[in-house]
Amino acid sequence: MRKLFLLGFIVAGLVLGNEANGYLEFNVTELDRIEDLEFGFSKFSSNFNPLMVGLTLIRGAGSKGAVCLDGTLPGYHLHRGHGSGANSWLIQLEGGGWCDNIRNCVYRKKSRRGSSNYMEKQIQFTGILSNKAQENPDFFNWNRVKLRYCDGGSFSGDSQNKAARLQFRGEKIWRAAMDDLKAKGMRNAKQALLSGCSAGGLAVILRCDEFRNLFSGWTRVKCLSDAGLFLDTPDVSGGHTIRNLYNGVVQLQGVKNNLPHLCTNHLNPTSCFFPQNLISQMKTPLFIVNAAYDIWQIQSSIAPPSADPSGYWHECRLNHGRCTPAQIRFLQGFRNQMLRAVSGFSNSKKNGLFINSCFAHCQTERQDTWFADDSPVIHKKAVAIAVGDWYFDRAEVKLIDCPYPCDRSCHNLVFR
């Protein structure tokens, strides 16, 4: 049975956004609000009793130049593993959009997305980060880490703007965090999984092979990208909203030198920030979890207000149930583009897929979409089981859902 998240209370925040360079600043408005719903529990539910994990600042990071946008220290949340998972490590890269110009990076540095001064001192560990076997059957007793995201460039930039007092040091944050975790035991890991959601899911794809090289040859190392398959596709006006955004990020934050050279040897740097141009070249096993009708991409790169001045897409972008037949056909075309983007990638036995026909975004950290009694399924397999089967080589997993509206197990996000 489909479960809808009725989110009318945040519609105003989603619709009212500042515009910069001709498109909505969705990187600090809409995506934040979508990802703030990541836990998948009602706080008033009797079952809402998640593990709370404290923030650790990386004390040696400053001397390495590894700092947030505002110059504060980066951080992570670590919950130690035990028993059979004591020597296994799961690193979750936080998502949260991007900043592509001075104006919205200055705005961002006054939030948890750009400064550890504003980060929560404790956060909930749910879904793939849960410490309960009944909620997270394969990874509950691993060392589980959530690396906070405060650089605005998917852990890939290395530059600065002195006039605006902005530090774009995502690549150095990544390295400093890995060094710190290695010193805390990760260097001896028998098993490791790098995962991430949204902008963190993109970072997984960018950093996966580098992550593999941190370990000895006998360590099982794989990567999981959740809602990170951002497509280089035109918006409803024929414009290039997301390409313009990514070009700004790459240029402003000095990302070029930190992109995979196999890609930049034949494509421009902005193209090499798009996962579709990277995934087939990766050497490390990768699992992709993505909604075929990714709600962030619908709202912010396919049909943002800047590409829809007449408001024709307004109702559809907030509630798929209000889309016209023509709009649904357009979204089916987007799904087809996504499937074409993973066609070569899926031919490799080492890789895995879970692409469900839902209007969702980030399904691995939400408890209700990761593993629960009514979780989304494809061929009766929930996301958690699919990922576990793939990681532990219990089965080859290439799960692609039938087109909307066939899947009644979706937990669709509805904003009105």
Swiss-Prot record:
Record's signal peptide: 1-20
InterPro entries: PAE/NOTUM (IPR004963)
GO molecular function: hydrolase activity
GO cellular component: extracellular region
UniProt KW GTP-binding keyword: no
Subcellular location(s) per record: Secreted, Cell wall
Disulfide bonds: none
GO biological process: cell wall organization
Domain of life: Eukaryota
Reported consequences of knocking out the gene: No visible phenotype under normal growth conditions.
Keywords assigned: Cell wall, Cell wall biogenesis/degradation, Glycoprotein, Hydrolase, Secreted, Signal
Catalytic residues identified in the record: 198 (charge relay system), 294 (charge relay system), 361 (charge relay system)
Glycan attachment residues as annotated in the record: 27
Enzyme Commission number: 3.1.1.-
Record-stated family: Belongs to the pectinacetylesterase family.
Function: Hydrolyzes acetyl esters in homogalacturonan regions of pectin. In type I primary cell wall, galacturonic acid residues of pectin can be acetylated at the O-2 and O-3 positions. Decreasing the degree of acetylation of pectin gels in vitro alters their physical properties.
Listed name of the protein: Pectin acetylesterase 10
Organism lineage: Eukaryota, Viridiplantae, Streptophyta, Embryophyta, Tracheophyta
